[in-house]
């Protein structure tokens, strides 16, 4: 890695550290699902998928920044938090040396996590799959419970039967996008659907 690449990588790390610090400090404790822990979880899943999908190191760095910011908009608003997160990216990342083209790619990835997901690029597919990685994992029930708890506050959803119906409707229309997520998570997701019925 040459000096210019090292400097760029250091700036990426500073930007990531900056937003993680804000997420830890400023996300509401009532965000039982979309808390700091969710961003950490998505980061782990995104890096696992990116590795398996053979993504370049420079694209992984952009992906890491997109993951770090993907739910940062929750600091300010609940609905349309993705757009608020993109605004934060546009306001913040130029000071860390990010180009307009990089910012555009990062915002594309953030927008790809909006439900219903409509990712276009490979990186957008990776972040979309990472954001919902838990749906096909063994820990899906406790994680889903944190989302139900959050929606009781933010979406006035209180009835467990309505919650299960909402989940089934969502799960029936959801699909993973990358070959890696399809391979790793589809069977687990189908088992989860079976248990909800």
Where are these regions (language model features)?
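His-Asp-centered metal-binding catalytic motifs of divalent-metal-dependent phosphohydrolases/nucleases
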Residues: 42, 60-76, 81, 85, ...
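Short alpha-helical hairpin
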Residues: 6-25, 38
């Amino acid at each position: 890695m040459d000096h210019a690449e090292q400097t760029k990588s250091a700036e990426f790390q500073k930007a990531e550290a900056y937003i993680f610090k804000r997420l830890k400090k400023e996300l509401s404790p009532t965000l039982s699902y979309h808390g700091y822990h969710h961003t950490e979880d998505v980061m782990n899943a995104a890096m696992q998928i990116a590795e398996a999908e053979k993504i370049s190191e420079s694209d992984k760095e952009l992906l890491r920044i997109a993951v770090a910011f993907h739910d940062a908009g929750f600091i300010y608003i609940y609905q349309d938090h993705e757009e608020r997160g993109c605004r934060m990216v546009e306001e913040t990342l130029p000071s860390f040396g990010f180009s307009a083209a990089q910012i555009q790619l990062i915002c594309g990835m953030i927008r790809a996590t909006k439900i219903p997901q409509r990712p276009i690029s490979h990186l957008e597919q990776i972040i979309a799959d990472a954001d919902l990685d838990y749906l096909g994992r063994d820990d899906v029930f406790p994680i889903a419970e944190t989302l139900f708890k959050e929606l009781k506050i933010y979406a006035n959803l209180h009835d467990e039967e309505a919650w299960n119906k909402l989940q089934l409707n969502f799960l029936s229309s959801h699909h993973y996008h990358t070959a890696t997520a399809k391979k790793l998570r589809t069977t687990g997701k189908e088992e989860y659907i079976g248990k909800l019925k």
